[in-house]
């Protein structure tokens, strides 16, 4: 796509307009004018209030509660943009919630991660930009290009800011699935690495087995892709404390904070729990967490990725 003839246009759904506005502020472009209405029968309709013809359109929509509304609104925005003769449409999905559903692990279920990918492409998405998929293989469900950003740099910088001698600490992976991310952050911090071996019994219940590594007397940095109900986090912190951890910091990409998560975090024996602004955390949740929650800004990273996609530059250079 020739960026000289294709204006950069950024629009937002309703799920996380503050992030979309911050992305535009970093890009130095105005947030596009659009509105979504809901009829009395619960149907949605999207209106663009400016021309999209031949534009390089980026639509920011995170898949947070209510997830089904967020997905439907994004598909309507993509379809409306294509109908308005947009030159290219990129779906910017900071948090892709159906990434957990990546395989058929029980009879008679849908692989929802693949289904949502199919729906987005059928709606007309030419490209997808997302961050820290729970299951990276979801990337392969798309036939269109997917740029998968990592928040590792942001999380690492945050730990260094909180603890100047972070290199003396230990990065703790809550399970085997997060060891790759933890090892990358440990490399950036030049710190130690540990892992908890555990068994997941259900979506909300885990059974820890053992901590592999040494955390005794050390500052521990727990990293993961997301916090949902915080049940797994409670177990991880409990084990780390029982093994002699001194101070505990937690940082994840996506702070979903569903169900009893906020109450659990407020009671948790940690210094701080940080998450990125891929999911909008309401002020009342921040207040109820007793000052333990922090929000990290990934708008500059998304803005750089959008700028590089628009001009045809590499995106992978942003987090290597």
Curated annotation (Swiss-Prot):
Catalysed reactions listed for this entry: D-ribose 5-phosphate + ATP = 5-phospho-alpha-D-ribose 1-diphosphate + AMP + H(+)
Keywords: ATP-binding, Cytoplasm, Kinase, Magnesium, Metal-binding, Nucleotide biosynthesis, Nucleotide-binding, Transferase
Enzyme class, spelled out: transferase
GO biological process, one term: 5-phosphoribose 1-diphosphate biosynthetic process
Cofactor descriptive note: Binds 2 Mg(2+) ions per subunit.
Predominant place of localization: cytoplasm
Binding site residues for ATP: 41-43
Transmembrane segments: none
Necessary cofactors: Mg(2+)
Active site annotation, chain numbering: 198
Coiled coil: none
Keyword Chaperone attributed: no
EC number: 2.7.6.1
Binding site for D-ribose 5-phosphate: 200, 224
One function term, GO molecular function aspect: ATP binding
Binding-site residues for Mg(2+) 1, renumbered to this chain: 134
Compartmental location: Cytoplasm
Residues the record lists as binding Mg(2+) 2: 175
Quaternary structure (record): Homohexamer.
NCBIfam families for this protein: PRK01259.1, ribP_PPkin
Annotated family: Belongs to the ribose-phosphate pyrophosphokinase family. Class I subfamily.
Function: Involved in the biosynthesis of the central metabolite phospho-alpha-D-ribosyl-1-pyrophosphate (PRPP) via the transfer of pyrophosphoryl group from ATP to 1-hydroxyl of ribose-5-phosphate (Rib-5-P).
PANTHER family (UniProt xref): RIBOSE-PHOSPHATE DIPHOSPHOKINASE FAMILY MEMBER (PTHR10210), RIBOSE-PHOSPHATE PYROPHOSPHOKINASE 2 (PTHR10210:SF32)
The protein's name in its UniProt record: Ribose-phosphate pyrophosphokinase
Organism this protein belongs to: Deinococcus radiodurans (strain ATCC 13939 / DSM 20539 / JCM 16871 / CCUG 27074 / LMG 4051 / NBRC 15346 / NCIMB 9279 / VKM B-1422 / R1)
Record gene name: prs
């Amino acid at each position: 796509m020739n960026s000289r003839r294709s204006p950069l246009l950024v629009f937002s759904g309703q799920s996380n307009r503050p992030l979309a506005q911050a992305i535009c502020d970093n890009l130095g472009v105005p947030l596009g004018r659009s509105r979504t209405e809901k009829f009395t029968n619960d149907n949605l309709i999207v209106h663009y209030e400016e021309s999209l013809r031949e534009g390089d359109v980026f639509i920011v929509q995170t898949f947070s509660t209510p997830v089904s509304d967020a997905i439907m609104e994004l598909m309507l925005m993509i379809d409306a943009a294509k109908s308005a003769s947009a030159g290219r449409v990129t779906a910017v999905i900071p948090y892709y919630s159906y990434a957990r559903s990546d395989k058929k692990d029980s009879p008679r279920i849908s692989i929802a991660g693949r289904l949502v990918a199919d729906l987005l492409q059928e709606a007309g998405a030419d490209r997808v930009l997302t961050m820290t998929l729970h299951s990276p293989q979801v990337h392969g469900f798309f036939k269109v290009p997917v740029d998968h950003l990592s928040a590792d740099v942001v999380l690492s910088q945050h730990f260094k800011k909180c603890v100047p001698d972070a290199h003396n600490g230990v990065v703790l992976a809550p399970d085997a699935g997060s060891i790759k991310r933890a090892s990358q952050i440990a490399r950036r911090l030049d710190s130690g690495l540990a892992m908890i071996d555990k068994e997941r019994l259900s979506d909300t219940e885990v059974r820890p087995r053992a901590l592999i590594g040494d955390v005794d007397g050390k500052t521990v940095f727990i990293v993961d892709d997301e916090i949902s109900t915080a049940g797994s986090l409670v177990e991880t912190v409990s084990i780390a404390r029982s093994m002699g951890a001194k101070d505990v910091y937690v940082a994840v990409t996506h702070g979903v904070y569903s169900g009893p998560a906020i109450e659990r975090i407020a009671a948790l024996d940690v210094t701080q729990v940080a998450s990125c602004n891929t999911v909008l955390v309401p002020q009342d949740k921040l207040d109820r967490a007793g000052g333990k929650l922090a929000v990290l800004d990934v708008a500059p990273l998304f803005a750089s990725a959008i700028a590089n996609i628009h001009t045809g530059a590499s995106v992978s250079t942003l987090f290597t």
